[in-house]
Amino acid sequence: MAVFRLSELAEQIGATLKGNADLAITSIAALNNAEPTHITFISNAKYRSQLSQSKAGAIIVTAEDVEFCQATQNLLIVKDPYLAYALLAQYMDDLPKSANEISESAVISATAKLGKNVSIGANVVIESGVELADDITIGAGCFIGKNTKIGARSHLWANISVYHNVEIGSDCLIQSSAVIGSDGFGYANDKGRWIKIPQTGGVIIGNRVEIGACTCIDRGALDPTIIEDNVIIDNLCQIAHNVHIGFGTAIAGGVILAGSLKIGRFCQIGGASVINGHMEICDGAIITGMSMIMKPITEKGVYSSGIPAQTNKEWRKTAALTMNIADMNKRLKAIEKQLTE
């Protein structure tokens, strides 16, 4: 178990240290469960009442939080405790490092190009023309299709399928069972018979992109599906063919993006939202969970259409009223007409 001096942690996050600089810290813990060898943080003012009672060895706080702490508590004072927590979590991360070995059970084409310090797990299949840069980890059971390129320091967890002609940038993290580059849902209809359209466009994923478990990103029909740098995508998302996701956008779990949708930079899309295709979402749009977006968004702001939960009795009344809106509107117009005559 690694041990960190409190002064070392303060330096990592640029914090002002109040208390014992030599305190030994072993890990990060939640505010209400932390022990004397733990460091914790507070990022929501409603938990200030717990500060003075915390058993944590040290607490990451803002200057405004200090008055709620005991004088004897060790504090790291920063502007943004949640950001500080994220940085410390990275610094203290004890995730086992890859062994930089290639499993004997891996099947690797003779034409594939492997960089330095590449780790390839059991039963991996790497087809012809694949290029893997330095310090890449490919987890057990992954499939990497023909002519795919993966950038330096990217990490693919187990059982990921990356189809042919896909480009994945540097420092990417892809969680288990994701599928990158499967066919887009493209068909022509001939008198009721569906004619499949080969999807030849591929997928281009930028640098520092994270993709959650079981997320599917379809290849483009002609041009590629594009995920720009610094995008984060949660689990169980469906990214259809020719979608273009802009720099720094965050997409929560269960989101469905229809084909040829273009999403701007720094957008945030809440879980289980559905967005129509062949349109654009402007930079900086925030879409709350369970929203259904059917028209383009042209102005930065917060957009919602999800229905908050009610008791079943209340919901049934609301649903009944909704079903009668057209009739109520017709009756209202008739009354207005009578009043004006």
Swiss-Prot record:
Belongs to the transferase hexapeptide repeat family. LpxD subfamily. The active site is at 241 (proton acceptor). This is UDP-3-O-acylglucosamine N-acyltransferase. CDD domains: LbH_LpxD (cd03352). Homotrimer. InterPro entries: Hexapep (IPR001451), Hexapep_transf_CS (IPR018357), LpxD (IPR007691), Trimer_LpxA-like_sf (IPR011004), UDP_GlcNAc_AcTrfase_non-rep (IPR020573). GO terms for cellular component: membrane. SUPFAM superfamilies: Trimeric LpxA-like enzymes. It catalyses: a UDP-3-O-[(3R)-3-hydroxyacyl]-alpha-D-glucosamine + a (3R)-hydroxyacyl-[ACP] = a UDP-2-N,3-O-bis[(3R)-3-hydroxyacyl]-alpha-D-glucosamine + holo-[ACP] + H(+). Transmembrane segments: none annotated. Pfam families: Hexapep, LpxD. GO terms for biological process: lipid A biosynthetic process. Its EC number is 2.3.1.191. Catalyzes the N-acylation of UDP-3-O-acylglucosamine using 3-hydroxyacyl-ACP as the acyl donor. Is involved in the biosynthesis of lipid A, a phosphorylated glycolipid that anchors the lipopolysaccharide to the outer membrane of the cell. Pathway: Bacterial outer membrane biogenesis; LPS lipid A biosynthesis. Gene3D superfamilies: 1.20.5.170, Hexapeptide repeat proteins, MurE/MurF, N-terminal domain. Keywords: Acyltransferase, Lipid A biosynthesis, Lipid biosynthesis, Lipid metabolism, Repeat, Transferase. The keyword Nucleotide-binding does not apply. It comes from Haemophilus ducreyi (strain 35000HP / ATCC 700724). It comes from the Bacteria. GO terms for molecular function: N-acyltransferase activity.
